[in-house]
Amino acid sequence: MMSRETLRALVEASHKRGKLAVVHVGTEQQARDAINASADGPAHMFTGEMAGADFGKFAASHSVFVIPTLATLYSTCGKSGAPALLEDPYLKSFIRPEGRVLLEQPWPYAKASCTGTATAMKELAEARVRILAGTDAPMPGTTYGASLHDELVLLVRTGLTPLQALQAATSVPARAFHLEDRGLIRAGMRADLVLVKGEPTRDIQATRHIIAVWKRGIRFQR
């Protein structure tokens, strides 16, 4: 366990070098310690019961972002979205064999509850804290690419609107990491695009029905 003094020193050293300080946390207290140490944001939400009822307001008052990695946390609670991904008609044919192995891999130890996770996420959403989509792949029950679609569903289930979930995977992380040339569809921006069938601003699962992908303006053949 890192001391608070060491944590603060590391955050300060990172900022002096012009770098963001994103801190791995596993409990509510660790998240609060990271935020109090002036970290730019904690990575991972926490499980179990919450000690306080003001985490969302606390995070908002420090202008941090949060990368909850719900896909992994819900896997630790025995509520993995992996089985649904493996059978999803739009995704399953694109999951590589090594990705399938990861999705089928059970978590080595299960936590009792994700109640605290859901409660904290609701508070963060109500306080309009910046949420960044991330999965923590390749942890058990997750894989690169496909698990992000599960993450978006969980973000909506725990308090974000579908539009906010889409922003959590596009414009919000681009701004948080100072990537000014991407994250939006706008003249002069990088043409990193995904075309889907449906209306993901109403039904977040529409992101799974991918028609085409472009990176730097070049269309990928699937």
Give the label of every model feature segment.
Residues 213:
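Short aromatic-centered micro-motifs
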Residues 10, 14, 34-37, 59, ...:
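Generic structural signal for hydrophobic
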Residues 18-20, 39, 64, 129, ...:
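Short glycine/serine/threonine/alanine-rich loop segments
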Residues 45-158:
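Active-site neighborhoods of metal-dependent hydrolases
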Residues 1-34, 44-46, 50:
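Histidine/acidic-residue-rich, glycine-tolerant segments that coordinate divalent metal ions
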Residues 143, 161-166, 175-210:
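Acidic, glycine-enriched loop/beta-strand segments at the rims
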Residues 14, 24, 42, 66, ...:
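Divalent metal-coordination and catalytic microenvironments
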